[in-house]
Regions:
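Glycan-recognition and catalytic cores of secretory/periplasmic carbohydrate-active enzymes
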Residues: 1-224
Length: 224
């Protein structure tokens, strides 16, 4: 998939910034993604495709990563707008996280349906919001990432835990129950989500500490 190749090229450029072939491929793939967004978007639909599908937040995350490497502020703005639109689609009226349900797949330009909800969506959302928070420091990204992680712990439509007591993760949330299977994808999604939210919390705590640190009147340096 181009989305995977985008991320690979970003890694290559991050280690060898002068790698011209990698940069050219990144420009091409990211440009295609941006063109899709600008072609498909319409009133009340700020997305790359006519449908919401699987692992949705990876699309704006990839575009946001590419914008950082390429120094494209226009690309960055479009990526943040798409992620913000997805954030609103994934927020229930009661305020908790509600990932795009699998019943939504194939429904063009329609609001997402609530079920079935899958662990992969919460992980992808946390990763994308963590990157967005690093980009602009907007508290909404931090809050939405926390809401997505809380989904695993019971802050969801049924009020039940998706994460199992032994550190595993069930396969999803159906309209009337939890799918008690524990596939590798679901377990890994929860484990990676836990790592991602820990990193986000550490970064946010460091920023909060810096903001609260008093500044000396002379010289403008932080007091110690």
């Amino acid at each position: 998939m181009p989305i995977v190749r985008d991320l690979i090229q970003i890694v290559v450029i991050g280690t060898t910034p002068g790698h011209r072939p990698a940069r050219l491929q990144l420009e091409s793939f990211a440009g295609e993604l941006l063109d899709l967004l600008r072609t498909v978007r319409r009133d009340a639909w700020t997305w790359f495709e006519p449908v919401l599908a699987y692992d949705n937040a990876r699309l704006p995350e990839a575009l946001l990563l590419a914008s950082t490497v390429l120094g494209r502020t226009d690309m960055r703005q479009d990526a943040l707008e798409a992620l913000d639109w997805l954030r609103r689609q994934q927020t229930a009226p009661e305020g908790h996280f509600r990932p795009v349900g699998t019943q939504s797949f194939g429904a063009a330009f329609q609001p997402p349906r609530a079920f079935d909800q899958q662990p992969l969506e919460a992980w992808a959302t946390i990763d994308a919001c963590t990157l967005a928070f690093a980009q602009d420091g907007d508290r909404q990204w931090r809050d939405h990432a926390e809401a997505a992680f809380a989904w695993y712990l019971g802050a969801n439509d049924l009020g039940v835990r998706i994460a199992s007591p032994d550190g595993g993760c069930y396969d999803g949330l159906q309209v009337d129950r939890v799918n008690l299977n524990q596939g590798a994808e679901s377990i890994l999604a929860y484990q990676f989500a836990a790592l991602a939210i820990a990193r986000l919390r550490n970064k946010a705590a460091a920023l909060d500490t810096n903001e609260q640190r008093p500044v000396a009147a002379s010289g403008g340096k932080a007091c110690r």
